[in-house]
């Protein structure tokens, strides 16, 4: 399964959670005000570690997100939008559970609205369940680059230019494409770029990766859903035509025709605090309406 549920519960009236982390956007006053409100409300109840970037803006001592697990942090409160969540997850090799406060727009990865934040955090401190979502390790010429939570996009390095490439699954040719690019998405990322490119929405309980060509030249190049434990290889075919690989829309790397890109399911899933019993299908419909 690519989505599993775990529980952390309190004993009696005692808080189950003793140490939490906070990491936020730093460029919006309302986001920083929310962080200040959380600190004012809960600093006397639990030990709070604030990310270095957020702490610098607030003028307090900070802790890198990468070190929060070593400090005994049990969950990270991410204040911002989906991009903030993805950046925070990417900083952790083995991600801590994330509780997302939605200060963005659409927000598929952030379930808590600002007006509900304090009450929700208070409930979570007495115990919570979390869901594990699969991620994908990205390798370039055998060297690991990053781990993607949402998607990996391979696109032309020059705007409005198509690229020609092959996609192999476990050494079997899936397709040879001429297109603007291709998106490889996890079930979590199937509602992001992959969906905009015409790919299917995948329930997180489905253990799969979706392959979505972006503006393909031939009509037979269609989206594919493949097993999550597959090894995917991407090879550029045209000499002197470079491409760019973008990971979760956060980091990008230039690739050349002689380069080999491989994608494999990661051993370290993302973990999201569960705060609602709303079913997946209803939740997606609500977000998209």
From Swiss-Prot:
Uppermost EC category: transferase
Which Gene3D superfamilies does the record match to this protein?
Probable inorganic polyphosphate/atp-NAD kinase, domain 1, Probable inorganic polyphosphate/atp-NAD kinase, domain 2
Q: What is its EC number?
A: 2.7.1.23
The species this protein belongs to is Methanosarcina mazei (strain ATCC BAA-159 / DSM 3647 / Goe1 / Go1 / JCM 11833 / OCM 88) (Methanosarcina frisia)
Encoding gene per record: nadK
Q: Which reaction does it catalyse?
A: NAD(+) + ATP = ADP + NADP(+) + H(+)
Top-level taxon of origin? Archaea
The UniProt entry, under InterPro entries, shows:
ATP-NAD_kinase_N, ATP-NAD_kinase_PpnK-typ_C, NAD/diacylglycerol_kinase_sf, NADK
Q: What is this protein called?
A: NAD kinase
An annotated GO cellular component: cytoplasm
The cross-references to HAMAP family, in alphabetical order and at most eight, read:
NAD_kinase
Q: Required cofactors, per record?
A: a divalent metal cation
User: Taxonomic classification, please?
Assistant: Archaea, Methanobacteriati, Methanobacteriota, Stenosarchaea group, Methanomicrobia
Q: What does this protein do?
A: Involved in the regulation of the intracellular balance of NAD and NADP, and is a key enzyme in the biosynthesis of NADP. Catalyzes specifically the phosphorylation on 2'-hydroxyl of the adenosine moiety of NAD to yield NADP.
């Amino acid at each position: 399964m690519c989505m599993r549920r775990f529980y952390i519960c309190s004993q009696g009236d005692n808080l189950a959670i003793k140490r939490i982390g906070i990491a936020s956007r730093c460029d919006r006053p309302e986001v920083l005000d929310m962080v200040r409100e959380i600190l004012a409300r809960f600093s006397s109840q639990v030990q709070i570690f604030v990310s270095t970037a957020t702490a610098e803006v607030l003028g307090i001592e900070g802790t890198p997100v990468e070190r929060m697990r070593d400090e005994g942090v049990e969950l990270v409160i991410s204040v911002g939008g989906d991009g903030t969540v993805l950046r925070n997850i990417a900083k952790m090799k083995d991600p801590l559970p994330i509780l997302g406060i939605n200060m963005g727009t659409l927000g598929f990865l952030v379930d808590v609205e600002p007006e509900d934040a304090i009450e929700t955090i208070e409930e979570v401190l007495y115990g919570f369940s979390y869901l594990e979502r699969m991620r994908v390790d990205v390798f370039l010429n055998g060297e690991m680059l990053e781990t993607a939570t949402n998607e990996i996009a391979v696109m032309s390095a020059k705007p409005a230019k198509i690229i020609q490439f092959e996609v192999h699954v476990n050494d079997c040719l899936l397709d040879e494409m001429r297109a603007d690019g291709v998106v490889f998405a996890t079930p979590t990322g199937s509602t992001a770029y992959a969906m905009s490119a015409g790919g299917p929405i995948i329930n997180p309980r489905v253990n799969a990766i979706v392959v979505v060509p972006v503006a393909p030249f031939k009509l037979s190049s269609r989206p594919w859903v493949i097993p999550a434990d597959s090894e995917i290889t991407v090879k550029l075919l045209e000499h002197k035509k470079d491409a760019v690989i973008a990971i979760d829309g956060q980091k990008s790397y230039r690739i050349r025709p002689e380069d080999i890109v491989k994608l494999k399911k990661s051993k370290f899933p993302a973990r999201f605090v569960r705060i609602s019993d709303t079913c997946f299908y209803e939740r997606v419909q609500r977000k998209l309406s």
